[in-house]
Regions:
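Extracellular ectodomain surface segments
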Residues: 8-96, 160-213
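Acidic, turn/loop-rich segments in luminal/extracellular domains of secretory-pathway
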Residues: 1-5, 84-154, 206-219
Length: 219
Protein backbone atom coordinates (compact mmCIF):
# COMPACT_ATOMS: atom_id res chain seq x y z
CA UNK A 1 0.00 0.00 0.00
CA UNK A 2 1.47 3.35 -1.06
CA UNK A 3 0.10 6.35 0.77
CA UNK A 4 0.64 9.65 -1.04
CA UNK A 5 0.49 12.82 0.97
CA UNK A 6 -1.82 15.69 0.09
CA UNK A 7 -1.71 19.32 1.15
CA UNK A 8 -3.77 19.65 4.32
CA UNK A 9 -5.51 22.88 5.25
CA UNK A 10 -3.77 25.04 7.84
CA UNK A 11 -5.55 25.58 11.15
CA UNK A 12 -5.99 29.16 12.40
CA UNK A 13 -6.90 29.90 16.02
CA UNK A 14 -8.70 33.04 17.17
CA UNK A 15 -6.44 35.42 19.10
CA UNK A 16 -7.27 37.92 21.82
CA UNK A 17 -5.56 40.93 23.34
CA UNK A 18 -6.44 43.47 26.02
CA UNK A 19 -5.25 47.08 26.09
CA UNK A 20 -5.88 50.31 27.97
CA UNK A 21 -7.37 53.12 25.87
CA UNK A 22 -4.13 55.15 25.82
CA UNK A 23 -1.69 52.28 25.11
CA UNK A 24 -0.14 50.26 22.30
CA UNK A 25 -0.35 46.46 22.21
CA UNK A 26 2.58 44.72 20.49
CA UNK A 27 2.33 41.00 19.77
CA UNK A 28 5.64 39.76 18.38
CA UNK A 29 7.34 37.27 20.69
CA UNK A 30 6.17 33.85 19.50
CA UNK A 31 3.65 33.35 22.28
CA UNK A 32 0.02 34.10 21.62
CA UNK A 33 -1.99 36.52 23.71
CA UNK A 34 -3.51 35.01 26.83
CA UNK A 35 -6.82 33.44 25.80
CA UNK A 36 -8.34 34.40 29.15
CA UNK A 37 -7.97 38.07 28.24
CA UNK A 38 -5.84 39.10 31.21
CA UNK A 39 -3.39 41.99 30.90
CA UNK A 40 -0.34 43.29 32.71
CA UNK A 41 0.18 46.59 34.53
CA UNK A 42 0.84 48.48 31.31
CA UNK A 43 -2.14 46.99 29.50
CA UNK A 44 0.05 45.00 27.14
CA UNK A 45 0.51 41.44 25.92
CA UNK A 46 3.27 39.94 23.82
CA UNK A 47 2.94 37.08 21.36
CA UNK A 48 2.26 36.18 17.75
CA UNK A 49 -0.72 34.82 15.79
CA UNK A 50 1.64 32.25 14.24
CA UNK A 51 3.39 30.07 16.81
CA UNK A 52 4.23 26.40 16.31
CA UNK A 53 5.57 25.91 19.85
CA UNK A 54 3.83 23.88 22.56
CA UNK A 55 1.24 26.57 23.29
CA UNK A 56 -2.33 25.33 22.87
CA UNK A 57 -3.39 28.69 21.44
CA UNK A 58 -1.51 28.53 18.11
CA UNK A 59 -1.95 28.38 14.37
CA UNK A 60 -0.68 25.16 12.82
CA UNK A 61 -0.59 22.88 9.77
CA UNK A 62 -0.64 19.06 9.81
CA UNK A 63 1.97 19.04 7.02
CA UNK A 64 5.45 18.83 8.57
CA UNK A 65 7.19 21.15 6.11
CA UNK A 66 4.43 23.74 5.71
CA UNK A 67 5.39 27.39 6.20
CA UNK A 68 2.54 29.50 7.51
CA UNK A 69 2.13 33.15 6.61
CA UNK A 70 -0.54 35.80 7.00
CA UNK A 71 -1.64 36.96 3.55
CA UNK A 72 -4.69 39.18 4.18
CA UNK A 73 -6.21 41.28 6.95
CA UNK A 74 -9.51 43.14 7.33
CA UNK A 75 -11.54 44.86 10.01
CA UNK A 76 -14.94 43.48 10.99
CA UNK A 77 -17.31 44.20 8.10
CA UNK A 78 -14.51 45.56 5.90
CA UNK A 79 -12.64 44.40 2.81
CA UNK A 80 -9.41 42.40 2.75
CA UNK A 81 -6.06 44.15 2.43
CA UNK A 82 -3.04 42.19 1.19
CA UNK A 83 -0.16 41.58 3.60
CA UNK A 84 3.27 41.87 1.98
CA UNK A 85 5.36 38.69 1.82
CA UNK A 86 8.28 38.70 4.25
CA UNK A 87 6.89 41.57 6.30
CA UNK A 88 6.59 41.99 10.06
CA UNK A 89 4.49 44.45 12.04
CA UNK A 90 7.39 46.93 12.21
CA UNK A 91 8.76 46.36 8.71
CA UNK A 92 6.41 46.80 5.72
CA UNK A 93 3.42 45.68 7.80
CA UNK A 94 -0.15 46.29 6.63
CA UNK A 95 -2.30 48.66 8.70
CA UNK A 96 -6.07 48.48 9.10
CA UNK A 97 -8.02 51.05 11.12
CA UNK A 98 -10.80 49.70 13.32
CA UNK A 99 -13.31 51.52 15.48
CA UNK A 100 -11.03 52.16 18.45
CA UNK A 101 -7.51 51.84 17.04
CA UNK A 102 -5.22 50.69 14.24
CA UNK A 103 -3.86 47.17 13.77
CA UNK A 104 -0.58 46.67 11.87
CA UNK A 105 0.25 43.06 10.98
CA UNK A 106 3.08 41.31 9.14
CA UNK A 107 3.24 38.13 7.09
CA UNK A 108 5.10 36.48 9.99
CA UNK A 109 2.02 36.91 12.21
CA UNK A 110 3.44 39.66 14.39
CA UNK A 111 1.13 42.59 14.99
CA UNK A 112 0.78 45.85 16.86
CA UNK A 113 -2.46 47.57 17.88
CA UNK A 114 -2.39 51.25 18.82
CA UNK A 115 -5.50 52.52 20.56
CA UNK A 116 -6.97 55.75 19.20
CA UNK A 117 -7.61 57.65 22.41
CA UNK A 118 -9.81 60.21 20.68
CA UNK A 119 -12.16 57.35 19.68
CA UNK A 120 -12.11 55.81 23.16
CA UNK A 121 -12.01 58.97 25.27
CA UNK A 122 -15.69 58.81 26.24
CA UNK A 123 -15.17 55.41 27.90
CA UNK A 124 -15.51 55.55 31.66
CA UNK A 125 -12.94 53.79 33.83
CA UNK A 126 -13.10 50.00 33.27
CA UNK A 127 -15.65 50.26 30.42
CA UNK A 128 -14.84 47.69 27.72
CA UNK A 129 -15.27 47.75 23.94
CA UNK A 130 -13.81 45.50 21.23
CA UNK A 131 -12.21 45.80 17.82
CA UNK A 132 -12.35 42.63 15.69
CA UNK A 133 -10.06 41.89 12.74
CA UNK A 134 -9.97 38.81 10.49
CA UNK A 135 -6.67 37.50 9.13
CA UNK A 136 -6.11 34.95 6.37
CA UNK A 137 -3.55 32.22 7.09
CA UNK A 138 -1.86 30.41 4.18
CA UNK A 139 0.46 27.42 3.89
CA UNK A 140 1.31 28.35 0.31
CA UNK A 141 -1.58 26.39 -1.20
CA UNK A 142 -4.58 26.35 1.12
CA UNK A 143 -5.93 29.14 3.32
CA UNK A 144 -8.12 29.58 6.37
CA UNK A 145 -9.18 32.51 8.53
CA UNK A 146 -9.41 33.46 12.20
CA UNK A 147 -10.11 36.57 14.25
CA UNK A 148 -7.98 38.90 16.32
CA UNK A 149 -10.19 40.47 18.99
CA UNK A 150 -8.78 43.45 20.87
CA UNK A 151 -10.55 44.56 24.05
CA UNK A 152 -10.02 48.24 24.85
CA UNK A 153 -10.49 49.17 28.51
CA UNK A 154 -11.41 52.71 29.50
CA UNK A 155 -9.33 54.74 31.92
CA UNK A 156 -10.24 57.75 34.03
CA UNK A 157 -9.31 60.78 31.93
CA UNK A 158 -8.24 64.04 33.52
CA UNK A 159 -10.97 66.72 33.59
CA UNK A 160 -10.34 70.10 31.98
CA UNK A 161 -10.79 73.22 34.12
CA UNK A 162 -11.17 76.67 32.53
CA UNK A 163 -10.27 79.89 34.34
CA UNK A 164 -13.27 82.03 35.41
CA UNK A 165 -13.47 85.80 35.90
CA UNK A 166 -15.93 88.10 37.65
CA UNK A 167 -16.25 91.73 38.73
CA UNK A 168 -17.73 93.67 41.64
CA UNK A 169 -18.32 97.35 42.40
CA UNK A 170 -16.13 98.87 45.09
CA UNK A 171 -18.76 98.86 47.86
CA UNK A 172 -20.38 95.47 47.19
CA UNK A 173 -19.71 91.77 47.67
CA UNK A 174 -19.92 88.89 45.20
CA UNK A 175 -20.30 85.25 46.24
CA UNK A 176 -19.85 82.35 43.86
CA UNK A 177 -20.93 78.73 44.31
CA UNK A 178 -19.91 75.94 41.97
CA UNK A 179 -23.39 75.02 40.72
CA UNK A 180 -25.47 78.13 41.29
CA UNK A 181 -23.14 80.47 39.42
CA UNK A 182 -21.80 78.03 36.83
CA UNK A 183 -18.19 77.87 37.91
CA UNK A 184 -18.25 74.38 36.38
CA UNK A 185 -20.24 75.37 33.30
CA UNK A 186 -17.19 75.73 31.06
CA UNK A 187 -15.24 72.86 32.63
CA UNK A 188 -15.45 69.41 31.07
CA UNK A 189 -14.54 65.73 31.20
CA UNK A 190 -14.41 63.42 28.18
CA UNK A 191 -15.61 60.43 30.23
CA UNK A 192 -19.32 59.90 29.51
CA UNK A 193 -20.72 59.65 33.02
CA UNK A 194 -18.20 61.82 34.86
CA UNK A 195 -19.71 64.18 37.47
CA UNK A 196 -17.57 67.23 38.12
CA UNK A 197 -17.36 68.72 41.60
CA UNK A 198 -15.24 71.39 43.27
CA UNK A 199 -13.06 69.69 45.89
CA UNK A 200 -10.90 72.58 47.02
CA UNK A 201 -10.88 76.38 46.83
CA UNK A 202 -7.83 78.47 47.65
CA UNK A 203 -7.43 82.22 47.38
CA UNK A 204 -5.01 85.12 47.43
CA UNK A 205 -5.97 88.60 48.70
CA UNK A 206 -5.54 91.43 46.23
CA UNK A 207 -4.84 95.12 46.81
CA UNK A 208 -8.45 96.33 46.74
CA UNK A 209 -10.39 93.87 48.87
CA UNK A 210 -10.34 90.62 50.82
CA UNK A 211 -11.20 87.09 49.76
CA UNK A 212 -12.59 84.29 51.90
CA UNK A 213 -13.22 80.72 50.79
CA UNK A 214 -14.59 77.37 51.90
CA UNK A 215 -14.84 74.06 50.06
CA UNK A 216 -17.89 75.30 48.12
CA UNK A 217 -17.93 79.10 48.25
CA UNK A 218 -15.71 81.98 47.24
CA UNK A 219 -16.55 85.47 48.57
Amino acid sequence: ITVTGINDDPVAQNDVGVILEDSTLTVANSANANVSGSYDATGEHSGDVIDTSSSSHTDSDPDDSATLTVTQIKKDGGSNSAVSSGSSYNSSGTSVTGTYGTLTIGADGSYSYAADQSAADDLDKDDQVTDVFTYTLSDGTETTTANITITVIGINDTPTAVNDTDSVTEDERVTKTAVQDDVLNDDSDVDDSAVLTVSNISHTNGNSGTVSSSTTHLT
